[in-house]
From Swiss-Prot:
One of its GO terms (biological process) is iron import into the mitochondrion. Belongs to the mitochondrial carrier (TC 2.A.29) family. The keyword Transmembrane applies. The gene is mcfF. The lineage of its organism: Eukaryota, Amoebozoa, Evosea, Eumycetozoa, Dictyostelia. This is Mitoferrin. Keywords: Membrane, Mitochondrion, Mitochondrion inner membrane, Repeat, Transmembrane, Transmembrane helix, Transport. Solcar repeats lie at residues 14-100, 108-192, 207-305. It is a multi-pass membrane protein. InterPro entries: Mit_carrier, Mitochondrial_sb/sol_carrier, Mt_carrier_dom_sf. Mitochondrial solute carriers shuttle metabolites, nucleotides, and cofactors through the mitochondrial inner membrane. Mitochondrial iron transporter that mediates iron uptake. Probably required for heme synthesis of hemoproteins and Fe-S cluster assembly. One of its GO terms (molecular function) is iron ion transmembrane transporter activity. The chain crosses the membrane at residues 13-29, 69-89, 111-131, 168-184, 213-233, 285-302.
Length: 308
């Protein structure tokens, strides 16, 4: 992550708060900037088997026709509420563990970096999962929901605390390997890319935007492709409901059709084959490539200006 400006972890307390602030800023910028693509991806993955197949463009047109341009941003409040704290936790713990495992930014151990990212994920997802569930319910234009507060209240009343953690196990199963690939790829790509775009001595360099854009984008794309099947399962689990109907394309009365992660994986394979696991893969790769470029650029920038 931040080896570009020769920072030291001598003041671990100060560094920890820098990472909290930088992580929060990066998470907010990433999710707000990429939200429309995430909405489209969620619609694609939530389409029921046997329903008419639709493209990203068709879904985009349908959402705008039915709900206006704001339909692409429905649920954004939930993301804004959850992204900043979850990313703050994620990056601060990641940096702390990376330092404990490796010690110096000059050393490079992809496996240790990946493990640090995976452990950080387990903590941050506990913060992010409830808002992720609310976000996806709102993204699918569930007409019974009047907004963030109403959606949150009704999930609590109808489904209890378990409703906010629907797909949580799948999220962890997906995000642990995702973040192993993601963080290891980012750090590795950054080491490779730095000599290409910079002629200065690495010890004298400050913030270099191109490093983080390219390394972040590449890492996000690789990790997204690797874990797409788990993301499909997670989306199906989080968006199923036994008490409301959806107004999306191919709308149909929703029922709880998946008993859990393993049942969802089995059912998708039987009913849809490999194509089911690959739903939304292209927009997801685009989304994670662009969002990762944003998050790393903003994160490293805030670390730099905060003196890290």
């Amino acid at each position: 992550m931040g080896g570009d400006h020769g920072h030291s972890h001598g003041d671990e307390g100060g560094s920890f708060y820098v990472h909290l602030i930088a992580g929060a800023a990066a998470g907010f910028a990433e999710h707000c900037g990429m939200y429309p693509i995430d909405t489209i991806k969620t619609h694609i993955q939530a389409i029921k088997p046997g329903a008419m197949q639709t493209s990203s463009l068709q879904i985009t047109k349908h959402i705008i026709q039915q709900h206006g341009i704001t339909g692409l941003f429905r649920g954004l409040t939930a993301v804004a509420a959850g992204a900043a704290p979850s990313h703050a936790v994620h990056f601060s713990i990641y940096e702390l563990l990376k330092f404990k495992f490796i010690g110096s930014d000059e050393d490079h151990h992809p496996i240790k970096v990946g493990i640090a990212g995976a452990i950080a994920t387990m903590t941050s997802e506990a913060v992010a999962s409830p808002m992720d569930v609310v976000k996806q319910r709102l993204q699918l234009q569930i007409t019974d929901y009047k907004g963030l507060t109403d959606c949150t209240k009704r999930i609590w009343v109808k489904e209890g605390i378990r409703g906010f953690y629907s797909g949580y196990t799948t999220t962890l199963v997906m995000n642990v390997p995702y973040n192993i690939v993601y963080f290891a790829s980012y750090e590795s790509l950054k080491k490779i890319i730095q000599p290409w775009f910079n002629n200065k001595n690495p010890e004298e360099r400050s913030y270099q935007l191109i490093d983080h854009l390219v390394a972040g984008g590449g890492a996000g794309m690789l990790a997204a492709a690797f874990t797409n099947p788990f993301d499909v399962v997670k989306t199906r689990l989080q968006t199923q409901s036994d008490f409301i109907a959806s107004s999306t394309i191919n709308s149909a009365k929703s029922i709880k059709r998946y008993g859990g992660m393993m049942d969802a994986m089995k059912t998708i394979w039987i009913e849809e084959g490999m194509d089911g696991y690959l739903r939304g893969m292209k927009p997801r790769m685009v989304f994670h490539s662009m969002s990762s470029a944003i998050v790393w650029s903003v994160y490293e920038y805030f670390k730099f200006i905060l003196g890290e």
